[in-house]
Amino acid sequence: MATKRKIKDDVLFRKNKILAYERSGGMCELCRCRPAQEVHHIVYRSHLGTSILSNLACLCLQCHNEAHGVNAKEIRKHLLDVVGVEQS
């Protein structure tokens, strides 16, 4: 059974993924070369990241795979800069 936190975050995600696509202009926010096809949580939900707009990045399939790969930490830092979020 889903927790209240997850249900609330799912509702927020549905709303903010549209805003994230608008912000990106439909392009991948990492490579800026290909159309965005997926919305990525910069701070993973499994690490208690939420679906606030500043934690979402629109990525193409290739960049989304890279964002979960061996360079995930560096990509995360770059995406935080791209979407205009200061790191704590």
Across the structure, where does each feature detected by a protein language model lie?
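A contiguous, mid-protein "functional segment" used to position or interact
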Residues: 66
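Histidine-centered nuclease catalytic patch
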Residues: 29-58, 69-73
